Curated annotation (Swiss-Prot):
GO terms for biological process: ribosomal large subunit assembly; translation. GO terms for cellular component: ribonucleoprotein complex; ribosome. Keywords: Ribonucleoprotein, Ribosomal protein, RNA-binding, rRNA-binding. The lineage of its organism: Bacteria, Pseudomonadati, Pseudomonadota, Gammaproteobacteria, Methylococcales. InterPro entries: Ribosomal_bL20 (IPR005813), RIBOSOMAL_L20_CS (IPR049946), Ribosomal_protein_bL20_C (IPR035566). It comes from the Bacteria. The gene is rplT. Binds directly to 23S ribosomal RNA and is necessary for the in vitro assembly process of the 50S ribosomal subunit. It is not involved in the protein synthesizing functions of that subunit. PANTHER family: 39S RIBOSOMAL PROTEIN L20. Belongs to the bacterial ribosomal protein bL20 family. Pfam families: Ribosomal_L20. Gene3D superfamilies: 6.10.160.10, Ribosomal protein L20. This is Large ribosomal subunit protein bL20. NCBIfam families: rplT_bact (TIGR01032).
């Protein structure tokens, strides 16, 4: 049986990593050893930030709802509590959108939340 040399496999692996590192600055896009580390780190950041994105958007929505509610003399917590008591189930994403784009609808919700 013939001996298998790994040149083809190594080249393919290197090409794959360098393709993933395309657009990186300097050696990070050209030197395999550096590019591999950069790609691994980028993957870790991407994994972490996919989870953080959910937290950040929720925080943004809450901030917008709070700002909208305070225009009607309500704090965020009292506004949400009032909606729950009135058995209105609108998620924070939609509430934030209403607070920014549809002031009249949000005002109606605030009136309901006040009791």
């Amino acid at each position: 049986m013939a001996r298998v040399k790994r040149g083809v496999i190594a080249r393919a692996r290197h090409k794959k990593v360098l393709k993933q590192a395309k657009g990186y600055y300097g050696a990070r896009s050209r030197v395999y050893r550096v590019a591999k580390q950069a790609v691994i780190k980028a993957g870790q950041y991407a994994y972490r930030d996919r989870r953080q994105r959910k937290r950040q958007f929720r925080a943004l929505w809450i901030t917008r709802i709070n700002a909208g509610a305070r225009e009607f003399g309500l704090s965020y917590s009292r506004f949400i509590s009032g909606l729950k008591k009135a058995s209105i189930e609108i998620d924070r994403k939609v509430l934030a959108d209403l607070a920014v784009r549809d002031k009249d609808a949000f005002a109606e919700l605030a009136r309901i939340a006040q009791g």
